[in-house]
Regions:
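Alpha-helical solenoid repeat scaffolds used for protein-protein interaction
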Residues: 249, 253-254, 266-285, 291-394, ...
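Intrinsically disordered, charged and Pro/Gly-enriched terminal/linker segments
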Residues: 1-2, 10-21, 53-64, 98, ...
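Short amphipathic alpha-helical recognition elements used for nucleic-acid or partner binding
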Residues: 427-459, 479, 557
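Amphipathic alpha-helical segments of tetratricopeptide repeats
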Residues: 8-9, 42-54, 87-96, 129-141, ...
Length: 612
């Protein structure tokens, strides 16, 4: 399918048939050639003002159809009040048989209402889009019908946080479009967007491949850019930093020949690129894209504030992040589909700032993500932070977080702070005092269990083997009577049933820091610190079997605290650095370098101007 040829000014001026001009405007829409479309509508307006135009056929009204198209374009540009005014004029003036004008006006109304974002406006948007789809079906316009379903799914469901409803409606739109529709590739892009948010990366890849095949045939440049951008989002969700950076740059190159960077679309692209690159730890490039988006020549700076809050909450100054996140929450409208992320980032900044309440906030964020469709929404959108906050949310009573930690396992075991064993239903597994509980804690340190001889030597070092085995059987009997079969014997090995154990997760999280870079390394360091909720095994202070683990935990804990303190100091985040250094000093009282660093940060804080 060839793209519509561009019209010269002379050719445009020569067009004198309103039907031809409207047809041209409709044709340009799926190609994203909005400047040309606007020029066509301007030409139609001038033609109608000069008069001398032949009367329209029955059921058509050139002026009302022009107003409906203008309303559609205004809605796309977020000029909501102006779009509503034109829609009202069309609906007041149209006769019932002006089907095209009324149907297109309903499409514009749905879009404008969806941008308002309130629950009531969203309900009205659903009704307007449904009305438009029915009208388009009645006049035999499946292409427009598909567009009404698509916009209902994307603007009224997806942006309002109903991802499951969005998937269903956009799937219906795709099935409604004729196979040769120019709008079908764009619909597949929107479908991929929803699947990406749902964490369905493989399915999204398949839809992108299908859209790419159609795009290669029809050559719509805008869709090609959108497809590349969707692949960048998938790469970021999978944690592939190299692919993310490459695809972001590729999308930018493809967009240069278009008018993206002359509009709000260009600003959004730059800011979202900054967020994606920061997500995978490409900090320097993330900062460059943010600065370009911040300096973009558009008056509204709400998007800039949102991205700045995201970057700061993830790995910048947590105090400033909390201030910005609170300011955004007090604003006119935070898009419903990202409310969960706003709450999650608030929880993360709260934790990093050393304040109380992070677990409760994370639990709320998880519930909000589930309300969008599934907890995979959070896992796909903020994978590191979701994983990091899950233990805090579980301690705050979140059943969603508990399921995340268990991942099909039979127990949650906490050895930091007050030891606790939690069953899949959230109830506490009470352990008998003495050796039965100590045995559980010992085995919890060793994912694959311990040889029976090691257990016997640990608990009964000076007892004859047969007597030791008899006593161990008594310990296991007491344990089984109270806690059930949570310890099993495999041949000559004793082990705990599959369990999530905080100290094992702490070591694994610390190991992940080593392979990361930039801002992501700092996030992963904080993620490991989130698991350290107190001294290791305080209930077994004299147990020799715990000494090695205690020393390893102490060393790793100090390394992580020093890492986040150094990063905070480099960014001038003095309170954040001070919080980390104070925690390190509790572990190591003799570190003079840390005391000196704390004094420097205290002096810097005193030198800061007081807030007004």
């Amino acid at each position: 399918v060839a793209a519509p040829a561009e019209l010269t000014d002379e050719a445009l001026a020569a067009l004198s048939d309103p039907a031809v001009l409207l047809e041209r405007a409709w044709t340009l829409e799926p190609w994203g050639r909005y400047a040309e479309r606007s020029a066509i509508l301007d030409a139609l307006e001038r033609l109608l003002e000069t008069g001398g135009v032949a009367p329209p056929p029955p059921g058509r009204d050139w002026r009302l159809e022009l107003l409906a198209e203008r309303a559609i374009d205004l809605g796309r540009e977020f000029k909501i009040d102006q779009a509503h005014a034109l829609v009202d004029e069309v609906t007041r003036s149209a006769n019932p048989d002006h089907e095209i004008a009324l149907a297109r006006a309903m499409l514009a109304s749905g879009q404008a209402l969806a941008w308002v974002g309130t629950d009531e406006a969203t309900r009205q948007a659903h009704r307007a889009f449904a009305d438009a789809a029915e009208r388009f079906a009645a006049i035999g316009q499946p292409d427009w019908q598909g567009s009404a379903l698509l916009r209902r799914g994307y603007s009224a469901s997806y942006q309002h946080g109903d991802l499951v409803g969005a998937e269903e409606l956009i799937r219906e739109a795709i099935d409604t479009y004729p196979p040769d529709s120019m709008r079908l590739p764009g619909a597949l892009v929107s479908y991929a967007d929803v699947l990406i948010d749902l964490g369905e990366f493989d399915r999204a890849d398949a839809e992108i491949d299908r859209a790419l095949a159609l795009t290669d045939r029809v050559g719509i440049a805008k869709v090609r850019v959108d497809l590349t951008w969707a692949r960048a989002r998938i790469a970021a969700g999978r944690g592939d930093a190299r692919a993310t950076e490459r695809l972001v740059r590729e999308a930018e190159r493809e967009a240069i020949g278009m008018d993206w960077f002359k509009t709000h679309i260009g600003r959004s692209y730059l800011l979202e690129s900054a967020e994606l690159l920061d997500l995978v730890g490409v900090s320097d490039q993330a900062q460059r894209y943010f600065e370009r988006g911040r300096d973009h020549g558009v008056e509204d700076n709400g998007d800039v504030a949102q991205t700045m809050a995201v970057l700061r909450a993830r790995s910048g100054d947590p105090g400033l992040a909390l201030e910005q996140l609170q300011e955004l929450a007090r604003g006119d409208w935070l898009e419903k589909r990202v409310v969960w992320r706003h709450t999650l980032l608030t929880a993360w900044a709260t934790f990093r700032a050393g304040r109380d309440g992070a677990g409760e906030l994370a639990a709320r964020a998880f519930e909000q993500a589930v309300a969008c469709g599934t907890i995979r929404v959070a896992q796909a959108g903020e994978p590191d932070i979701t994983a990091a906050l899950a233990p805090l949310a579980e301690r705050a009573g979140s059943p969603v977080a508990r399921e995340l930690l268990l991942a099909g396992r039979g127990l949650i075991v906490r050895l930091f702070g007050t030891p606790a064993v939690v069953a899949p239903d959230g109830s506490e597994v009470r352990l008998p005092p003495g050796m039965p509980g100590e045995l559980v804690r010992l085995l919890a340190l060793h994912e694959h269990g311990l040889p029976l001889e090691v257990v016997l030597e640990t608990f009964f070092p000076d007892v004859a083997p047969e007597v030791a085995r008899q006593r161990l059987r008594q310990v296991l009997t007491r344990l089984r009577a109270t806690a059930g079969d949570i310890v099993v014997r495999d041949g000559e090995t004793l082990r705990l049933i599959p369990a999530w154990v905080d100290v094992r997760e702490f070591f694994a999280a610390g190991n992940r820091v080593r392979g990361a870079r930039g801002s992501r390394a700092v996030r992963l360091a904080y993620a490991a610190l989130a698991l350290h909720s107190g001294p290791l095994l305080p209930s077994d202070p004299y147990a020799g079997w715990a000494e090695d683990s205690r020393e390893r935990v102490r060393y790793r804990h100090l390394v992580l605290l020093d890492q986040v303190a150094a990063d905070a100091a480099a960014r001038g985040s003095h309170q954040e650095a001070l919080t980390a250094l104070e925690a390190a000093l509790e572990e190591d009282q003799n570190a003079e370098e840390r005391r000196a660093a704390m004094n420097r940060h205290l002096q810097a804080l005193r030198a800061q101007p007081a807030a007004t």
